[in-house]
Amino acid sequence: MKNKLLALFLLLISFYLFSQEDQKKELNISISSGIPMLHPHTAFDAGEAQILTALCEGLFVYDPYTLQPVPALAEKHSVSGGRTWRFTIRKDAKFENGKPITAQTFVDSWLNLLNPTGNHPYASLLDCIDGAADYRNGKLKNKNQVGIKAESGQVLLVTTNTEIEHLPNILCHHAFSAVEASQLEAALKFSNIERIEKLKDSFKPISSGAYKINKFSEKELILVKNEHYWDKDNVQIPQINLFLDLSKEEAIEKFNIGKIHWLSRSDVISKIGDQRCVNIDPLFATDYFFFKTSSPNIKDAEFRNALLLAVPYEELRKGYPIKAETLIFPLAGYPKIQGVNEYNLQKAQEIIDKLNLNEEQKKVVIKIPESTYYQELAEILSAAWSKIGVKTEVKLISLNAYYNSLKSNDYDLGTITWIGDFADPLAFLEMFRPNSNLNDSDWKNQEFERIILKSHAEKDFKKRYEMLSKAEELLLGESVIIPISYRLSVNIIDIYSIGGWYSNAIDIHPFKFIKFIKPQPVPGLVKLNK
């Protein structure tokens, strides 16, 4: 009995000592390159979204495993009549500077996001709120008429223009975080900046999240626990060190000797010593080309259809692990629809002949980022379309300026990789709604919009998915996009010694849940020095 008690005592001591050491350990990661844009109203790429899970919090946060909304700055919420939402803000919710976060904080933050002069990327996701779309588009001048009110200091009142079951899922996104009043106007400064080139031009948010910025340089971003965070006692890692400028060789070496815990890059996979750490998973993301349907040469759906019929899809999609024929990655329960895959050169030529176009009308300007990858795809399309008498011009734009350039009207075909911001078809379909800030294609279809609006009120998710699949069929049927591939996420992380991190469809891993756990080594395996 004494031996058993001694063994139990030693076991408890070992766990206690590990726990004590664990609470002092820093997390070292490299998931983004360059100086990140950290204003929640203007941040756009996946690396920035991940960093903002540490610095900015809204009413809800993603569950790290299921991606379902978990109460964050709102401790509870209620819905009455399907369209009146009340969110109760936590009494101990504060920014890092100690200022309270109230219902009015969210009113000001969301109205700032909707500012019609800002054209902020995710603002249109709030169009389900009374008056939001009209205010965002400049039709409604009085922002006080938008259905976002502070009913009291702690209660945020939101009225929607339709029943929308999945509103909490949308509100997990960083764009709907609490923003400190003194930093609201800064969003306008960054609204037309695609990439921060110099540190002096960067933005440091006053944190509403689990961590705050301790140091920000061109090479690293150091985050420490926010002592004013409402849930600070459950945040286990005291400091996160993000390396912003690591070469491939540095990344490999630092990971293999244990100086980096998490890498997000695919060019190092073969050199990782412990291949258990390589996590490759399907991502709710699609690579595709889209037509600028407002362009005089591209506005005719028949001409677009001819171009699609002339595309050799096997050649265009070769080498991709998961080839895409539709816009939306096939979620569980989402109906299978007819994809874009028909190659019929004769039919394409017949359409071109019937349209009786002149030489200038048979020209397509392809705008792509400067990269060998996109140039190869553009060459395939150019060669294919030349067979039906269509000439192409390829415009190369630096990656730093590319995505902002898609707002212009100097091209006919652009490309993008889109990662769903929440695990729902609407995360993709939103980009093609008539008044969406994300709609670079300029495609407008009122039947498409009618289906989207009707789906908001549908409570049966299968019926809702059926409705949304009809909307996607409309989009594909009008030859607006050329799907290429569904993306994979690549994360190199030892999930046997790091807990709270799970592979998921949108590759978002809220930092507040990540922690070190007792390692589970593989017998005979050692870390490599090189």
What residue spans do the PLM features occupy?
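N-terminal lobe/hinge region of extracytoplasmic solute-binding protein
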Residues: S30-G81, L111, I206-S207
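Local pocket/hinge segments that shape ligand/substrate recognition
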Residues: S32, N234, W262-Q346, P369, ...
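Extracytoplasmic/peripheral linker and loop segments enriched in polar/acidic and small residues
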Residues: T326, E393-Y402, A427-Y496, K527-K530
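Long beta-strand-rich cores associated with HINT superfamily self-processing modules
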Residues: N491-K530
